[in-house]
Design a protein with these regions (language model features):
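Amphipathic alpha-helical segments of tetratricopeptide repeats
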Residues: 319, 396, 412-416, 449-453, ...
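Helix-turn-helix DNA-binding segment
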Residues: 825-828, 854, 859-931
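Short secondary-structure boundary elements
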Residues: 38, 184-409, 413
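Extended alpha-helical scaffolding segments used for macromolecular assembly and cargo binding
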Residues: 29, 43-47, 312-313, 332-333, ...
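Alpha-helical sensor/transducer elements of the RecA-like P-loop NTPase core
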Residues: 127, 138-203, 207, 214-217, ...
Length: 931
């Protein structure tokens, strides 16, 4: 008995007690009930063995559907071992036969206690069924224990009356076998696979569905170590005991139940991936659930069954463990393998048809588009208008929730439906844009090319052309991108607004290739002089941008012209270019609040399913704003800063490098730079930004010669593009610092003076202050000190976001004062620099200020008092765990600390970091993940 699961042991003990009473002359009918596969036969065999061990004779029969047409087939099985029966003549009359069987049975039982064991009595022929019922009325004073097993399971088809339907409860003892509990099932799995992992055991338990038959069949198929993970399809199982057991389980339930079970399995397939496990912050789960009452009606309609019976079956199967409710409350199969086994043998065409029928029925019932669309993903084309509408609505909802993979899948499925060319063009443009952004497939550009070849509305054709041009330029094919836009431009001679859109996009995309850029900007500037009305406000904004980078205008003039352009009536097609260009120039002009407002306004107008060059441009400006403010920790916390898929340098990688250096991770910055492949990088402005950033990282780690090479190469490339202003990459002052470190001050002074001249043209505190500071370091002496003091004065009155430059200027002034022997003033400057750097979290600047303080003769501080560098190792560890979303209790358990200790450390960390809420931790700790 110890080998039996607990659910069987209780029944076996009860049967043993009843057998003892029968041996004492108090017979009874015991009905052992249970669902298919719950072990009725196993328990009955145990009772037979126990009875024989106690000297009881045993008569047994196993009923079968084949016996239904043979009168007394079950009784004849029982009587076969009885010697007296062989001598009796059976005339075939029911009443005579029944009396004869009872007489022979009583005679046989007089000699010794008797156990009559009938398995699957619900399958007995009608005559035997009546005889067993009548016999049960007369065994209470005989030494006979009549034990019958009966299937007791809720089926869609109403069952026939059971054995005890007409018997008094006093004559019957009913035992019901419950399904296996998760613990009992896990014990059975571990008894066969002692070394199995917890997840493997859990998969087996769920696939076994609380059913001993299914669980043992599964364990037979899994064998000894053949499957490191539990499969999700029956095809992976050998020899196939599990799917055979599931098939038998379904057959036992009848055709109606089988149809309902398969209909639910088809629906269940469509629910896979219904919603992501984690959604972006602030996004709620989509309304994908089908209400339970509607689900029963839906399945009933698909299977041609009674909705009330279907609802009861769903409830019963959930109780047995075959089904489990998901997070939306829908009953689903306990494991994908069980669901697949239910569908085994169903042809693929029938399954696809079932999904189509399910989708149509759901649509008619008003189920959410997402749920309908997931059924359509598994169906053949339907050809009805509602199909494409439901799929597109589901795609829109997925995009709203940030589930771009789902949106792309829905759009792919939509394209399989019959569509007009114009409709297909729009969908191909959206899908191609999503696939290009995903980087997981190369289908994006071919789809966009196909979209452009289809006839459609002019504005849709322009959208397709801009999307294709953006994709081509992003892959380094700038010439092809501009050619695409020009080709479409030639076809739209009567649409001046759309032509301006294409021309503006050509100008922006040309930034990715120096030769194309020169040609396009020459045309743009000529057009601005000859026919300014032709290029529109966005074109004029690009002219302002070009003049700014060429060092031809001041920041004040640039912003004045751009604000005037922004005040003019907007062209919806070109407005994104105007806003994005104005945002970039505002950031260069240190008008950071205005730049930030423009970025947010521009991003609101961008569609996630439509490639547009301004989307990437606006994202770059947002990163530039964070860097300008010295918010390096926030930059490193951005999702793109931790994206391991990016292997070529870009503006974002440049910001990661600069932020790592600023936060004291110089060695890590160099390793990151070396991990990127510059050979495959397009010859674009982004490569130049990266070369500058790599130079900063090399200089910070002592590779001055390597840094100088990067700065000069950056300058050569920028000059070739007519980008001479230091507003983008101040390579001259960076190279000057390297020249100075290499002992070539005259060359350093020349570079610094050249940049100062260009900086005074742009005339913002950041650019002028930086040039003055480097020129001061290169010049030295009294003149150098005067230049450093001028830089500090200028930067003290600068707009917000220039504090990192002020810190550098204070360090330069402090070093100059130390060299001049004015150590008191030097220490004051350097202490201010250290305090400002500490508040900013600028670890490298703080270290430089501390080093300069030491050179001035001041006592070095032991450590930072605020900022992320001030955290102790314990505080940082706890803060990082909290930033990852762990609760105080979880942190305490993980680190074996008291919860109060965790709370104390977090309170101290908040104070040092200058924050007030747990949600701010990830932004200030400044981790770049894999990078």
């Amino acid at each position: 008995m110890s080998a039996l699961p607990p659910e069987h042991r209780d029944a076996a003990r009860m049967l043993a007690v009843e057998a003892a009473w029968a041996r004492a002359g108090a017979g009874r009918l015991v009905l052992l009930r249970g669902a298919t596969g719950t072990g009725r036969t196993t328990v009955l065999e145990g009772a037979v063995a126990d009875a024989q061990a106690h000297g009881m004779r045993v008569l047994r029969a196993r009923c079968s559907p084949r016996d239904q047409g043979v009168p007394y087939a079950t009784v004849l099985q029982l009587m076969a071992p009885v010697p007296e029966f062989g001598e009796a003549a059976f005339a075939g009359d029911d009443r005579v036969g029944a009396a004869l069987f009872r007489r022979v049975l009583h005679s046989y039982a007089d000699r010794a206690p008797l156990l009559i064991a009938v398995d699957d009595v619900h399958l007995a022929d009608p005559a035997s069924h009546r005889w067993l019922v009548e016999s049960a009325r007369h065994v209470d004073r005989l030494r006979i224990l009549l034990v019958a097993t009966e299937r007791s399971q809720y089926d869609v088809d109403p069952p026939a009356p059971g054995l005890t339907h007409t018997l008094s409860p006093a004559l019957v003892r009913t035992l019901t076998l419950a399904p296996l509990t998760p613990n009992s099932a896990a014990e059975l799995v571990r008894s066969a696979h002692a070394d199995a992992s917890a997840s493997w055991v859990d998969d087996c338990v769920r696939a076994g569905a609380g059913n001993p038959l299914l669980l043992r069949a599964l364990l037979d198929d899994l064998g000894a170590g053949r499957h490191p993970t539990v499969p999700t399809t029956s095809a992976a199982l050998y020899p196939g005991a599990y799917p055979a057991a599931v098939s038998w389980w379904l057959d036992s339930a009848g055709p109606g139940t089988g149809e309902v079970a398969r209909a639910l399995a088809a629906l269940d397939e469509g629910w896979d991936g219904d919603a992501p496990r984690e959604l972006p912050n602030g996004v709620t789960r989509p309304d994908t659930a089908c209400p339970s009452d509607e689900l029963a009606s839906l399945i009933a309609e698909l299977a041609g069954a009674d909705p009330a019976r279907v609802a009861g079956w769903l409830t019963a199967m959930t109780g047995l463990g075959v089904l489990r409710p998901d997070l939306d409350g829908r009953p689903r199969y306990a494991h994908p393998l069980l669901r697949d086994a239910v569908l085994t043998g169903v042809p693929a065409t029938r399954r696809r048809a079932a999904h189509a029928a399910a989708a149509e029925t759901m649509h008619r019932h008003g189920v959410s588009p997402d749920t309908v669309a997931r059924q359509l993903l598994l169906s053949d084309p339907v050809g009805e208008p509602w199909t494409s509408a439901a799929l597109q609505e589901a795609a829109s909802l997925a995009l709203r929730d940030g589930r771009t993979d789902d949106a792309a899948a829905f759009l792919r499925r939509t394209l399989r439906e019959p569509l007009t060319d114009a409709h297909r063009q729009r969908l191909l443009t959206e899908l191609g844009s999503l696939e290009y952004k995903a980087h997981a497939t190369s289908a994006g550009i071919p789809r966009l090319s196909e979209a452009l070849r289809l006839p459609g509305a002019p504005q849709d054709t322009v959208r397709a052309a801009v999307a294709l041009g953006t994709a081509l330029a992003g892959r380094g094919r700038t010439v092809a991108a501009v050619d695409v836009l020009r080709t479409v431009e030639d076809e739209l001679t009567d649409r001046p607004q759309l032509i301006r859109t294409l021309q503006t996009a050509s100008v922006l995309l040309s930034e990715q290739d120096p030769s194309v850029r020169t040609e396009v900007y020459r045309w743009l500037c000529d057009a601005a002089e000859r026919a300014p009305e032709l290029i529109g406000t966005a074109g004029h904004a690009l002219v302002v941008r070009h003049e700014a980078t060429a060092g031809l205008i001041s920041a004040a003039e640039a912003m004045g012209r751009l604000r005037a352009l922004l005040a003019q009536p907007a062209d919806p097609q070109t407005e994104p270019f105007l806003i994005g260009t104005a945002a970039a120039v505002a950031q260069w002009a240190d008008e950071l609040p205005e730049a930030e407002r423009l970025v947010e306004s521009g991003l609101v107008g961008q569609r996630p399913d439509l490639l547009h060059p301004m989307h990437e441009a606006l994202a770059n400006v947002r990163a530039d704003i964070l860097a300008a403010r010295g918010e390096h920790a926030r930059l490193l916390a951005e999702p793109w800063a931790r994206d391991p898929a990016r292997t070529t340098p870009s503006n974002r990688e440049a910001h990661v490098l600069l932020s790592l250096v600023a936060t004291g991770e110089e060695a890590r910055a160099v390793r990151f730079a070396e991990s990127l492949d510059l050979r495959s990088a397009p010859d674009s402005w982004e490569l130049n930004r990266f070369l500058y950033a790599r130079g900063v990282a090399r200089a910070a780690t002592g590779d001055t010669a390597g840094a100088l090479h990067d700065f000069l190469e950056c300058g050569r490339r920028q000059s070739a593009r007519e980008v001479v202003s230091p507003i983008v990459t101040p390579w001259r002052t960076a190279a000057a610092e390297c020249r100075l470190a290499l002992g070539r001050p005259h060359e350093a002074i020349a570079l610094a003076e050249e940049e100062l001249g260009l900086a005074r043209v742009w005339n913002t505190p950041r650019t002028v202050g930086r040039s003055l500071r480097v020129l001061a370091e290169a010049t030295g002496g009294r003149r150098g000190l005067e230049l450093a003091e001028e830089a500090v004065r200028l930067l003290r009155g600068a707009p917000e976001g220039t504090e990192t430059e002020l810190v550098s200027a204070l360090i330069a002034q402090g070093r100059g004062l130390t060299a001049a022997g004015d150590r008191g003033r030097a220490r004051a400057c350097l202490r201010e620099a250290a305090e400002r750097a500490e508040r900013l979290g600028a670890a490298r600047q703080w270290a430089l200020a501390e080093e300069a303080l030491g050179e001035s003769g001041a006592r070095r501080t032991a450590s930072a008092r605020t900022g992320s560098r001030s955290l102790t190792s314990s505080e940082r560890r706890i803060a990082e765990l909290a930033a990852d979303g762990r609760t105080n209790t979880e942190i305490a358990d993980l680190l074996h600390l008291a919860r109060r200790t965790v709370e104390t450390h977090l309170t101290s960390s908040y104070r040092k970091l200058g924050i007030h809420r747990r949600g701010e931790l990830s932004g200030v700790l400044g981790r770049a993940g894999g990078k």
